[in-house]
A protein has these predicted regions:
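Conserved beta/loop motifs at nucleotide-recognition and modification sites
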Residues: 208, 427, 662-666, 670-672
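Basic, glycine-rich polyanion-binding accessory segments appended to enzymes
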Residues: 61-62, 657, 662, 671
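Accessory, non-ATPase domains that flank or precede helicase/AAA+ motor cores in DNA-metabolism machines
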Residues: 1-356, 368-384, 667, 694, ...
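Inter-lobe coupling/hinge segments of SF2-like helicase ATPases
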Residues: 196-202, 206, 218-654, 661, ...
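Short beta-strand elements
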Residues: 512, 668-680, 720-727
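Short, intrinsically disordered low-complexity segments
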Residues: 43, 673-701
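Beta-strand-connecting loop/turn residues
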Residues: 2, 42, 461-463, 687
Length: 731
């Protein structure tokens, strides 16, 4: 008999230990196989963590141990899904992020390989059958047979489904002129791009590449101004590692950036690339994962979750736009791709390159301390100048355009001039929808999400009110539910309204919009960006998705419609985010041969994040913001952990939060500051009340032990959920 130790996924319970099952079958089963097992009154899928051979029968074992073993129902896999390195990584993440191991394993794997019941219905390997040439001898063939034989010979192979005559095919096979070859099908098609000769490097780029290759640092920060040629540095380094038998993992912070990077890399490495991100179909993810695991792919391009790609001989990990918060996952396990990259680099002997024009304060601080290597690209390629910038004070009556509530006189004039010159424009507003809330003019009622208790945003395109936090949707009402009034007012503005205003002011201009509403439909992002790249539209309107990474050669004007919107958010990172967004947006202008200009509209023109973002003066911003962080004891001067409790009862969630705080205080941990419990900005999640505690600390070891003990103790309680977020971006 074999006893299997199995980690089980359960929707309601945090099962953070293996369960023992008897396996009486004869199938091969090892660590890393999935099995179906009975658990309570359900049949669940789990991962085998160990196999114990025993000479005892099931009955003898139960009699000896006084423990009744349930039996494994079936072994699902024919091969191991997880290698030893992946198990070690999962164990590290489980401990580091205080998350059950099974949940980490779910995060690491594509849908069809997850330890979940739904994965059993997922697509498996797809195949295609080809007709290949065996002999070009035409002797004894009919005219039609010769025609098809020549076609196969010319193309070397054709798909069987394209061979229209079944009888001719069967005859050619019988005469040993052609043969059928069955091959695994790749469901993801990468559009072929003409192979290009690498661009000539600038002196700065040459020095950057040489500096990285000769550095002994495991992690290096590449800080380069917008348009300085960081992408070419990435490509050359990837080429170096590929030529030396290594593989490369290239991460982007948003899916919208993958088409552009795929195009860049496919011009150099077409047959070696695999793609991983959430917009792929389950079948495509499965195919790409298999190509990576088998060693066919040498380069993986993808978003955050691609960090788990099982590349062989990993040599280089690149995080482009490393400062972007989407590298951090919000749901458990709340991992940061950089932390996973560091673990993999250490275990697999790889190097890490972090690239950004506006690095996170934590990364730049480590670079200046010598913890990371530090490389700078201070100039744009071809010695191009940075865009001229003008800050527009929206409180100044002389700036106001009486014919437009959204655009100042200066920005509107500049837009007209750019359009007259057939130049392109980018307009940024980091808020989607038409209006952020709808209120009743008579009684003041504001339409709110029933589960989150925050204002619903109005989307004019589909006449809906939407919650941007939980995706609750309702038809836009015409009557106030409180007083019955029909006088409803749409307050504020989003990207939809910007698009409407542009169309009103410039009716002949062709506009495109790119935000998360547009990107929800697969392929929309690529279509919008390709159209704008091909100059099929004059103006691109969007959220932060359009602010970073894109290289539009004909864009000469950027307008940041409301630059200070993020400064009102309750976050210690609000100034940093605002600075980064302005800097990145301004950097989209003037990347070609024409000079660029940017207009930054704001109600806070003297704020240092706005002023220095307009100048792209990162060094000065870094000094000011680091002083602020030091005074308030926020990262990088301290570490953070947020504890988020949710419960159906408002009183109970507060009581448990106080209990946790008391347990932490009893440990008397040195240099630990406990803030809260407090009710966050979004005070409800899924109709459950929320409270938070924030921990500031400097020594990790003791806090890890205490939090793990608290987590396991509270796991015995029911009716609430606890999320532990290490190094949170927000709280």
């Amino acid at each position: 008999m074999r006893i299997l130790e199995v980690y089980i996924e359960h929707a309601a319970l945090d099962l953070d230990r293996p369960f023992s099952y008897a396996y009486l079958g004869d199938k091969k089963v090892e660590k890393g196989y999935r099995v179906s097992v009975p658990f309570r009154n359900q049949i669940l899928i789990g991962f085998v963590s160990s196999v114990i051979e025993t000479p005892l029968t099931k009955e003898e074992y139960e009699e000896k141990t006084a423990y009744i073993l349930k039996e494994v129902i079936d072994v699902i896999d024919e091969e191991c899904l997880l290698n030893d390195m992946q198990w070690k990584l999962a164990t590290f993440l489980s401990n580091y992020y205080f998350t059950p191991l099974i949940r980490v394993l779910q995060t690491m794997l594509p849908p069809s390989l997850k330890p979940k019941s739904s994965s059993l219905k997922a697509p498996k390997i797809a195949y295609e059958t080809y007709v290949e040439i065996v002999s070009s001898n035409e002797e004894g063939l009919t005219d039609q047979q010769i025609e098809w034989l020549r076609r196969v010979a010319k193309e070397e192979r054709i798909l069987k489904k394209d061979f229209r005559s079944k009888s001719i095919l069967e005859k050619l096979i019988a005469l040993e002129r052609v043969k059928l070859v069955k091959e695994e099908k790749r469901r993801l098609t990468i559009k072929s791009s003409p192979m290009e000769t690498p661009k000539a490097l600038t002196e700065d780029q040459q020095k950057a590449i040489q500096s990285f290759l000769t550095s002994s640092k495991e992690t290096t920060l590449l800080e380069g101004v917008t348009g300085s040629g960081k992408t070419e540095v990435y490509l050359r380094l990837a080429e170096h590692y590929i030529q030396n038998g290594k593989s490369v993992l290239f991460l982007v912070p948003e899916i919208s950036l993958t088409p552009m990077m795929i195009e860049y890399f496919s011009r150099r490495f077409i047959e070696k690339i695999a793609i991983l991100h959430s917009e792929l179909t389950p079948g495509q993810k499965y195919d790409e994962y298999r190509r990576i695991a088998s060693g066919q792919a040498k380069i993986v391009i993808g978003a955050r979750s691609a960090i788990f790609a099982p590349l062989k001989n990993l040599g280089l990990i690149i995080l482009d736009e490393e400062h972007v918060e989407t590298y951090k996952q919000e749901n458990a396990p709340c991992y940061h791709a950089l932390e996973v990259a560091k673990w993999r680099a250490k275990e697999e002997g790889a190097r890490i390159l972090l690239g950004s024009a506006t690095p996170s304060l934590e990364s730049r601080a480590r670079a200046l301390k010598g913890v990371y290597g530090y490389i700078q690209l201070a100039n744009r390629i071809h010695q191009g100048a940075l865009p001229e910038t003008e800050i527009i004070d929206l409180l100044n009556p002389n700036s106001v355009d009486k014919d437009s509530v959204l655009f100042s006189l200066s920005l509107r004039k500049a837009m007209k001039e750019a359009l007259d010159k057939k130049e392109q424009i980018v307009l940024l507003l980091n808020r989607r929808g038409y209006a952020p809330y709808v209120s009743c003019r008579k009684c003041g009622y504001v339409f709110k999400c029933p589960t989150c208790d925050i204002a619903l945003s109005y989307h004019k395109e589909d006449q809906m009110l939407k919650c941007h936090h939980c995706d609750f949707v309702m038809q836009a009402p015409k009557v106030c539910p409180e007083c019955g009034s029909t006088y409803l007012s749409k307050q504020g503005f989003g990207t939809e309204r910007i698009e409407e205003e542009v169309t009103r002011l410039f009716p002949h201009a062709k506009t495109l919009r790119l935000d998360s509403d547009v990107s929800k439909v697969r392929q929309n992002v690529e279509k919008v960006l390709k159209k704008f790249q091909n100059q099929e539209a004059d103006i691109l309107i969007g959220t932060q998705m359009i602010a970073k990474g894109h290289d539009f050669q004909n864009v000469t004007l950027v307008g940041v419609v409301l630059a200070d919107m993020g400064l009102t958010m309750p976050s210690f990172r609000s100034s940093e985010r605002t600075f980064q967004l302005i800097t990145q947006a301004v950097g989209r202008a003037g990347r070609g041969t024409k000079k660029g200009k940017a207009f930054i509209q704001t109600y806070m023109p003297t704020h240092y994040a706005v002023r220095l973002g307009a100048k792209q003066d990162y060094a000065h911003f870094f000094q000011i913001e680091m002083n602020s962080r030091r005074m308030q004891q926020y990262p990088p001067y301290t570490y953070l952990i947020s504890l988020t409790l949710t419960c159906i009862s408002e009183d109970k969630v507060h009581d448990i939060a106080l209990e946790i705080k008391e347990m932490l205080e009893e440990e008397n941990i040195e240099d630990l500051t406990i803030l809260g419990p407090t009710v966050p900005y979004i005070k409800k999640q899924g109709n459950m009340f929320v409270e938070q505690l924030l921990l500031k600390y400097k020594e990790a070891k003791k806090i890890e032990i205490v939090l793990d003990k608290i987590r396991r103790k509270l796991a015995l309680k029911s009716g609430y959920r606890l999320k532990i977020d290490r190094d949170p971006y927000d709280f």
